[in-house]
Regions:
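Bacterial N-terminal signal peptides that target proteins for export
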Residues: 2-12
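Bacterial N-terminal signal peptides
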Residues: 13-21
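C-terminal motif of bacterial Sec signal peptides marking the signal peptidase cleavage site
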Residues: 23-25
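Conserved N-terminal structural module of periplasmic/extracytoplasmic solute-binding proteins
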Residues: 27-85, 89-92, 103, 107-110, ...
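Helix-loop-helix "hinge/cap" segment bordering the ligand-binding cleft or interdomain interface
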Residues: 88, 147, 151, 445-546
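Surface-exposed loop and turn segments in beta-propeller and other repeat-based domains
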Residues: 99-102, 156-167, 293-295
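Hinge/lid segment of periplasmic solute-binding proteins
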Residues: 408-461, 475-479
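Conserved small/polar residues in nucleotide/adenosyl-binding loops
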Residues: 548-555
Length: 559
């Protein structure tokens, strides 16, 4: 779930408070260490806002220009507005190319060997009976060819059964190899159609499963990614054998490949949502170029990316803020660290980086000209070994400056004096405890010291009929069980299964059964027995279908 703007602003403010407070406590020591650890080169982002767009359907680069297809709803006309835009990185100007596709849409774009832009056009046609009622429609595909300078459509070719394309085909991925052959993935009956430049069938390669993506290397060879036994596999399309090759072997095993794009300085670029690698097929290597987060980019929001002739990386991201979808074009330039303004480094340690935290860190890094937050994700590859490494770092004094303990038992570390008390820093920064929900802060207290700060919390409550509950505003576990005993013929908690209700009652009443000071547990008393007796009266598994049948509980029985 995305944070709305108000919550996101609060999140960044809280992070900034924590970061600045910590730096005051560290006395700058971390900065000296971070300077020695800076890499020789970093990728520096430059931003170009593309405005509001409901959908960016495809993007490619040709020489120093990026072309992208957009769809956006026009409130004035009540219709979807479509078009192809291009951004020139030399002139720093964007231009909208007029494209009239009628009721159709652009599914994909590619560059032909002669420098034209090939557009895969999809159109759905509804049919009507004699009464004007819509019947089952049908879809059709065509390839249009556009001049990248003038925007003129220079040719149109239909794709149909005459070309060997199935009538019910659903074409998604589309690429063109160095010889001008067209590769089209049909997801309705998994196969790859290979058509010549004049759209004659070259091969129809049947697949046992779906592919994730199709892409081209810098020499025009076509590859696919798909899920295998050990993670995401990369395979080459072998036209000689009319089949996929065996999985390519690389020196790194990437479990999640989120996208591959044609390279200029390498065979192709690989994105695993966290890091971008340069692939060398012959050497079998993935060479790390940069982490998205270090370039102030949320890798989860990357739609398209590629490499320009001069080695710069272009990226298109899309972010939804709850109301609008905002697209942004970035240009990442490789620079020596010594040429870039130095920032004080602060490290956040986490077992798994939540997307909201990631976005907040990026916003902070963009807004601060003095500090930069880097992230060390301990549990990315293996949870247990990551936790072991985290504990070792903390014990040796080389742990992170900040800790995201969403997946940690923070009390174990607080008891050992690992964390700073945040109250003095709040007071020094002018943040008053009474401006927050104090009992939420107190949940992260230990012996009157604040060891954690949450950015949000949820409240679970129960509502019932006032005629039955009266002015009751709350109850203890014992009072609730008394109420259930007094209303055995009523449905106190509808739609609850045994397992769900047992979890709910025990989880929310742990203090009844556990003495947190001594660690003593008491699950053999009368209150716990009453919970077991009550949950046993509930169905083992609740059937949602009962909501719509005569077997559903009558509303008059509910309290």
């Amino acid at each position: 779930m995305k944070l709305n703007k108000k919550r996101k602003t609060l999140f960044v403010a809280v992070l900034m408070f924590l970061f600045l407070s910590l730096l005051a406590g560290c006395g700058g020591k971390k900065t000296e260490e971070a300077d020695t650890e800076r890499p020789e080169y970093i990728y520096v982002p430059e931003y170009f806002n593309l405005g509001n767009s409901d959908y960016i359907g495809s993007a490619i680069n040709y020489e120093n220009e990026v072309f992208y297809y957009t769809e956006a709803w026009d409130d004035e006309t009540g219709k979807s507005r479509t078009g192809i835009s291009k951004y020139n990185f030399e002139s720093r100007k964007s231009e909208m190319i007029s494209l009239d596709v009628g009721e159709a849409s652009v599914s994909a774009m590619q560059i032909t060997p002669d420098g034209k832009i090939a557009l895969l056009i999809y159109e759905w046609t509804n049919t009507e009976d004699e009464n004007g009622e819509y019947q089952d429609g049908s879809g059709s595909y065509a390839l249009w060819y556009m001049d990248p300078e003038s925007g003129e459509i220079t040719g149109q070719k239909e794709l149909s059964e005459e070309n060997g394309v199935a009538k019910d085909a659903y074409l998604g991925s589309f690429y063109i190899d160095a010889q001008g052959n067209n590769y089209l993935f049909n997801s309705s009956d998994p196969c790859i159609y290979v058509l010549s430049g004049d759209l004659q069938m070259v091969a129809a390669i049947s697949l046992s499963d779906y592919i994730n993506q199709m892409f081209a290397s810098k020499d025009g060879e076509i590859y696919v990614t798909l899920y295998g036994n050990t993670g995401t596999e990369i395979r080459k399309i072998d036209l000689t054998k009319k089949a996929l090759s065996d999985p390519l072997k690389f020196d790194k095993e990437l479990m999640n490949i989120n996208g591959c794009m044609t390279g200029i300085s390498c065979d192709f670029l690989v994105n695993d949502q966290n890091t971008v690698y340069a692939a060398d097929v012959t050497a079998g290597t993935f060479t790390k170029l940069f982490d998205w987060l270090d370039a102030d980019v949320n890798g989860n929001n990357v739609n398209y990316f590629g490499e320009l002739p001069d080695g710069r990386i272009w990226v298109i991201t899309s972010t939804y803020d709850g109301n609008n979808n905002e697209a942004e074009l970035l240009l990442l330039e490789k620079k020596k660290s010594s040429e870039v303004a130095q920032k004080e480094e602060v490290t956040l340690g986490t077992l798994w980086l939540d997307d909201n935290v990631k976005s907040a860190i990026i916003d902070f890094n963009k807004s601060s000209d003095k500090y930069h937050i880097s992230v060390k994700t301990y549990g990315q590859d293996d949870w247990e070994s990551g936790l072991t490494q985290f504990n070792a770092d903390v014990a040796s004094g080389s742990g992170p400056d900040l800790v995201d303990f969403s997946n940690l038992n923070y009390t174990l570390y607080a008891e050992k004096g690992v964390f700073e008390d945040l109250y003095p820093y709040m007071e020094k920064s002018g943040l008053k405890k009474e401006n927050y929900v104090e009992n939420v802060l107190e949940a992260y207290e230990m012996d009157g010291k604040l060891y954690g700060f949450t950015t949000e919390f949820s409240i679970y409550t129960i509502v019932g009929k006032q005629s039955v509950l009266g002015e009751l505003s709350g109850w203890t576990l014992s009072e609730m069980m008394d109420f259930i005993d007094q209303h055995k013929d009523s449905e106190v908690f509808p739609y609850a299964s045994q397992q769900y209700m047992l979890y709910l009652l025990v989880y929310n009443n742990m203090d009844e059964f556990i003495d947190w000071e001594s660690g003593k547990c008491s699950f053999d008393g009368p209150e716990f027995a009453r919970i077991l007796e009550y949950t046993k009266t509930l169905p083992e598994q609740y059937n949602d279908c009962l909501l719509y049948t005569s077997d559903a509980a009558d509303d008059s029985l509910r309290v």
